[in-house]
Each structure stands twice: as C-alpha cells, then as structure tokens.
Curated annotation (Swiss-Prot):
Pfam families given in the database record: Pkinase (PF00069)
PANTHER family: MITOGEN-ACTIVATED PROTEIN KINASE (PTHR24055)
Keywords: ATP-binding, Kinase, Meiosis, Nucleotide-binding, Serine/threonine-protein kinase, Sporulation, Transferase
Protein name: Meiosis induction protein kinase IME2/SME1
One example of a Gene Ontology biological process annotation: meiotic cell cycle
Amino acid sequence: MVEKRSRQSSSSGSEFSVPPDVDNPPLSIPLKTLSDRYQLIEKLGAGSFGCVTLAKAQFPLSNILGKQHDIRGTLMDQPKNGHQNYITKTQGVVAIKTMMTKLHTLQDYTRVREIKFILAIPANDHLIQIFEVFIDSENYQLHIVMECMEQNLYQMMKHRRRRVFSIPSLKSILSQILAGLKHIHEHNFFHRDLKPENILITPSTQYFEKEYMNQIGYQDNYVIKLADFGLARHVENKNPYTAYVSTRWYRSPEILLRSGYYSKPLDIWAFGCVAVEVTVFRALFPGANEIDQIWKILEVLGTPIKRSDFVNTNHITAPPPGGFWDDASNLVHKLNLKLPYVEGSSLDHLLSSSQLSDLSEVVKKCLRWDPNERATAQELCEMPFFENTVASQVDARGNVTNTEQALIFAGINPVATNTKPIYFNSSTKLPAETESNDIDISNNDHDSHAMCSPTLNQEKLTLVEFLNEFVEEDNDDHSIPDVGTDSTISDSIDETELSKEIRNNLALCQLPDEEVLDHSLSNIRQLTNDIEIINKDEADNMEQLFFDLEIPEKDEFQRKQPFNEHADIDEDIVLPYVNNSNYTHTDRSHHRGDNVLGDASLGDSFNSMPDFTPRNFLIPTLKKSREKFEPHLSNSNQHFGNVTF
C-alpha cells in the first residue's frame, strides 16, 4: 500500500496531499520553489484556468532563455529573442499564469492543453514568449512564466476612443495577428479562442531598444502577440468536440449550429470578425445570446439556405453575401429552429472606404457560412492587403486546404486523388459528452459572459469539468516531443462543454501575498497602469446593427482614468469610414450567458431575448412567451478575466 503523504502550505496554512510521484516529476515541468524565484507584485486577473500575477524575477532572465536542454523546438526555445521586450526583461518583469486546480499526480500536468501546446509549437515572434514552466515545490501548483506585454488589443481600442488606427498601423496589426495564427495552423493546431482580449500589444518603442530598432529597420508602431492557448487543439485529436469553445461574438456558424466537427476554419472566422472590429472599433456580431448571435450573422451574411427551399419563393437569386451552406438546413432542423429568409447586406458596406477595398476582400474570404469555403491562413497571407507585410514574409510551408484538414481528421492521407470535398456534416456528430459531477473543488460563481449547459445548469466548476476543459486524454493521435511528458494516467472522460469563467477567487490561487517594497520597482508598477481592470458589466443596448456606425452614448462604460499617451503612437486620426464617438466593445461578459441551443428543450430559453428577434425564427410549436430584455448595469461584481497574457 502506498503511503499517502500530506503537508501544510506555508502561504495558506491549509493541509494538502503530496502527489504520489513527487520524487519523479516530469522532465519538461520540473519542481521549483516559486517564492525563491519570483517576487509577486500584484494579481492582474483570473479565469477558469487560474490567475495571472505580475512578478519580478530574482535572477537574470537571460539565465533561462534558450539554455534549457529539454525545451528545443518548443515555445520556450527562444535563444535569439534577447532584444525582444528588452525593458521588462532587463528589469525582470514577468507575468505568471497559475493553474487554479491541483491535479492528483505531477505527470497529470503534462496533459494540460496549454502545456501540450507549449511543448509542441516552436517559438514565433507573434506568439507570447514563454520563459519557463514549473510546478511549485511548496504547494504543487502549475506555473507558466511569460513575458509581460503592455495591454490587450481591446484595452488599446477602448483607450483610443475615436482615434482609429491609420491604414499602415491597421495593416501592421492584422498582418502580425495573421502571421501568429498561420504559425499555429502550420503546426496543425488551432487556437479556438481568438479575440481582442487574447491579442496582446506593446508599442514597439517600449518593446525594443532604440539602437536595435534602427539596426534592423523596424517600421511597425506596435508589437502584436497571440496569447492564451488554454483551448488550443491539435487537428488530429479525435476526442469529442466541445460545443462551447470560443467567445460567442467570434463563434463560427458550425459551432453555433452544433455541426459536430470543427477545425482551423473557426479561427479564420474569428480573424474576420477581429479584422472588422479593429478597423471600425465596433464588434461585428455582438449577440446577446446564441439565438441573437445567429440572427446578427443572418442580417449581414444572409440566409445560407437556397431560396427555393422556402415556401413563398419561387425564383432563384444570387447567393447571399455569406454564400450557401448545404448543411445549414439539416442542422437548424435538429435544433428545432428554422431560419427566416434574409437577403443580408453586402460586406462592402462594412468597410466602404476605397482605402479598405483590399481588406474588404479579406473579410469576405473569412466570413463564409460554409467552413470549407473559407480561405486558409496561407491564402489570406497571399492576398493584396497583406502584400509586403510580415504575413507575406513568413515561411510558406504547411499550406494545407480546409478539405485536406478534414481528410486528415478522417484518417485519410490527402493525396492528389482525393479531390472530392469533405463537408462538415452533423450526421457524423460524435457521441454525446459524458456527464460527471462527482468532485466539486470550489463554490465558485460563474462570469456572466459564457454559456452554461442547458442540461446540467450548474453554478459550480467541478474538477471533472476543469479536466475536460483544460486537460486532454492520453490517446491523442499527434505526438509530443519525447521529453518524458507522457502521463501514466489514462481515463475515459470525454470533453464537455466549456464552462463559464469563474470569478476572481484569490484563495484558490494560493500565491503568497508578498508586498514588494523595493522603490526601484516603481517603474515596474508603472507598466501595470496601462493594464485596465475592466468591469464585467452588462451592456445596455444591443439592438443596433454594426454597420449603422451610430453608437449610443455609453459613458458609464468608460473607465475614469487618464488616457495612455504612451500606448498611442499614431497621430490623432479620425478616418472617414468611422464616425463613432466612443469605442465600447460591449464585452461578451456584459450580457446574460443564456444558452439557448443544445439537446434540451428550447422552450424556456428565450426569456431574456430582445424584442427584435423575428417571430418566425422559432418553430411555432415552441413556447413563444418572452420577457422584455431589460439591460442593467451591475457595479457590484468586478471581474478580472479580460487581463490576459
């Protein structure tokens, strides 16, 4: 019989079990003492995975950059990046992401999705730099140490208000996002949560030494990095697919309509949504819930079902702006819904300026109903808008079409003879997710911005849910570098729906609450002034279409803090294609997290629907009573989920 050991945490005083394999930690995730290596300055945010803390390294960061023998070919292998983020590296400033849940064994941490991604993806200039990954030897929590960026893209846009990006800056920002996304896709992963909050930005003058910038001739005003790889998935992973990945506003039709399979095209859809939002400082599809999300897409892209399928139409017209999707009719029928006929609006109306005609073509290639019709990241890089940008200069390898990705998923080698398109079809839907609620790790409330399961209707994040969201099974078909990271634990837990982000719960983080009194760190604290802690309030008006471009006054959403002049490199530009007076992203968290799609009856799901949803959107047999949508502000609940590294 194995003796069960326990010890007392020095930070919280509580007892916890010592992992049975404490004497045999994974080679890729060693045991180290957090308090010996880093001084914790302040907590920046928290989410379902854990919390992010600003910290100062108590050793030169150059000691670990690219010098660890077991990290070659991973996101930690960055020996040539000494000039990047020079100021914060010199000061030893880092961001530490701490996993909130403790797993049974140390080897189990190698199954965490973000760890698998870090160990499988080579470093790239447009992905957040990872310094080290380790397990704290005092309380056995997982820590991911990464570079600290100034703010995320949403915060930058909100600070700028009416000052939209100039065309060169816009092109630079989007090309860097696309370059990072292309790098992920080339290595057969897809991000699954691309949104402005997960795109980090720092002015280039604060990121590089001036001498180095002049030496390499760096012209871009900003440095852009993709972050938060907790939902990243390998294309050959055949475990059941989660229905609630991605953030609702950037969620693709195949996810909204429960197609049963998705891959890289969902990132392309999200990129198209982000591209429009970064251009006009207004979310493209700000749905209040999933039904409203589908309706907002219909208003712009039109109905993807051929008009001959509708009773009162008997003449054929041109395809809708978003194209046709043969699977759509079957998918909505299985959800007990029906789509009204909507012609849609030309995508050219979204970006009407002649200066943005090339970008408009990019968006059209991204926002297609049928995932197989969307461009690949490589194809987007080759479009005129990205000519002579970093997106067009990256390595051209890994140019695989979406059809070939589906063939790979089906276990078929994509050779030249396989020319028949493989479609996303709900008839191949994978088995329903396993339901398990045995172990409850905390009494955490959920954020208001994500969907909860209609069948479980839980208010707690269980350990099983956490493992399903962030920890993969061991039977993945893709390989991870052989650095002793394979877990010896095997289970049959299927991947279930993505739970809502829990509120900031510092007790679960179990990080030492150390006060750093060193006055030399005042410049470090200054770095956090630009990282805005955003109130997760509910939006007060969601009834306007994006392309009306008349944004109601929402002063109550604006933070009472000075504008960050250092984050604004461009001149005060107000371009003719935008006339908004304030950028109010109306974050997804400002809305009620009503889940109105799924296996359960939809009858009671529309109680919080706005009045403008058309009546014929619902099958007549369903319950039609709906309460009027009464948005309200909630100042009592402050969340920190938008601060992402």
